[in-house]
């Protein structure tokens, strides 16, 4: 785990149940981008869920900017006990010209070579949402504050078998 998170547990995908759920989603994603895995229309036989884990993030904990290995990665937010609107009102965040407290954020290089950020503000509306993205895309999770409940997320990496 790249993060500064105290509790993270490895999960097992028994009988490839989770991979079978993810495969059509990944196929749609890759087909939309017109990415060909092989000469076949379906990529079902080419995917493997390499790693699967759950993070229990407490206030002040964070995941610094990092990427993953493989083809695709994902995060599913299971519990988000904070609201970004309140988090962005914390004095040190409010006084910032770019508050990111509690956000999930991608970092990428745009078409003219400038490094850009894309933040996804976190609140309970994101519970149950899955975000699928290329594994090499750099991302980070900012800490949240003033909340004793845990933020719970499930993440994983998909590779070509």
Give the ranges of each region predicted by the language model.
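Short hydrophobic beta-strand segments that form the core of ligand-binding sensory/regulatory domains
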Residues: 153
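Short, charged beta-turn/beta-strand-edge "cap" motif at the junction between a beta-strand
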Residues: 137-140
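Non-heme Fe(II)/2-oxoglutarate
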Residues: 1-46, 51-63, 100
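Catalytic core of non-heme Fe(II) oxygenases with the double-stranded beta-helix
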Residues: 53-132, 142, 149-150
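Double-stranded beta-helix
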Residues: 157-161
């Amino acid at each position: 785990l790249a993060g500064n998170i105290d509790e993270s547990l490895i999960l097992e995908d028994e009988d490839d149940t989770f991979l079978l759920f993810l495969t059509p989603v990944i196929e749609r994603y890759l087909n939309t981008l017109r990415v060909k895995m092989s000469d076949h229309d379906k990529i079902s036989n080419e995917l493997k869920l390499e790693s699967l884990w759950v993070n229990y993030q407490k206030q002040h904990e964070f995941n610094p900017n990092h990427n993953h290995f493989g083809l695709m990665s994902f995060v599913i937010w299971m519990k988000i006990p904070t609201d970004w609107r309140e988090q962005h009102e914390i004095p040190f965040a409010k006084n910032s010209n770019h508050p990111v407290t509690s956000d999930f954020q991608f970092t990428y290089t745009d078409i003219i070579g400038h490094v850009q950020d894309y933040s996804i503000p976190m609140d309970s509306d994101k519970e149950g949402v899955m975000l699928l993205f290329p594994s090499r895309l750099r991302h980070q999770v900012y800490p949240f504050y003033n909340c004793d409940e845990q933020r719970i997320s499930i993440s994983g990496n998909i590779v070509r078998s």
